[in-house]
């Protein structure tokens, strides 16, 4: 999920916007920092039954976005082992991209789930914390992204679920709320309607790739509606370098694991 928002955030320094068009408040000093809370049975401050109901619907929406293909999407990029598509939505926008990797779906997902390594391939992350795990397949993670120019930093508070869709590995994320984890002063909380990763086996190609990865997100980044179209298209152009970073760190991780 992080990579989609990271690319959206990276477009802020390219978008010009007057102060009159933006309603972001100036950052204020705030000593409060989100503290890590881990409880295997429940996570303090969150309503698990409500989250479970919400994620059930989100998984269905995720599956629909995966299965609908790219009809109606704008093609943002299509070369060098990476295809990027985007479309406007009634709320926010949808970004979808695919690329292939020379590792199995299980190996790829294992690497992407290692929170401690995310900053090695996503330089836009300022801070990331696991708030807690309900079990090995369900977690809540807080992520804060770096500020760009006059734009306030973005942050997400997301519930993540590892599951199977169409018989393939997937990780689906949605935004959650908690009074214990309010939006920090000087930051804008991004709303994730649904986001995630989907990894499926493919016939090995000439480069040794054997998994097709699809990453998608439907989000509201807290931008004025007039800027969504510009943001989604520019964000799409920043994705290919990110996928290359992921592949580089993925290879490094498994090479070092053999030592």
What are the residue ranges of the model-derived segments?
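Eukaryotic helix-grip
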Residues: 2-259
């Amino acid at each position: 999920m992080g990579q989609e928002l990271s690319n959206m955030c990276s477009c802020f320094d390219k978008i010009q916007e007057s102060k009159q068009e933006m309603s972001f408040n100036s950052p204020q000093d705030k000593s409060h920092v989100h503290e890590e809370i881990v409880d295997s049975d429940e996570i303090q401050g969150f309503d698990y039954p409500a989250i479970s109901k919400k994620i059930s619907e989100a998984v269905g929406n995720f599956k629909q976005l995966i299965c609908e293909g790219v009809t109606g999407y704008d093609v943002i990029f299509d070369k060098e082992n990476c295809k990027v598509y985007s479309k406007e939505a009634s709320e926010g926008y949808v970004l979808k991209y695919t690329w292939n990797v020379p590792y199995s779906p299980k190996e790829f997902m294992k690497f992407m789930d290692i929170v401690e390594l995310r900053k090695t391939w996503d330089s836009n992350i300022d801070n990331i914390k696991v708030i807690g795990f309900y079990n090995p397949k369900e977690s809540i993670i807080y992520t804060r992204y770096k500020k760009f120019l006059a734009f306030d930093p973005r942050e997400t508070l997301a519930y993540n679920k590892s599951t199977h869709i169409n018989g393939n590995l997937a990780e689906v994320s949605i935004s959650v709320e908690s009074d214990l984890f309010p939006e920090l002063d000087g930051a804008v909380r991004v709303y994730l309607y649904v986001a995630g990763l989907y990894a499926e086996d493919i016939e090995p190609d000439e480069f040794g790739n054997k998994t097709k990865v699809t990453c998608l997100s439907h989000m509201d980044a807290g931008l004025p509606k007039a800027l969504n179209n510009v943001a989604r298209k520019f964000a799409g152009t920043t994705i290919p370098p990110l996928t290359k970073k992921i592949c580089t760190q993925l290879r490094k991780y498994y090479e070092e694991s053999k030592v």
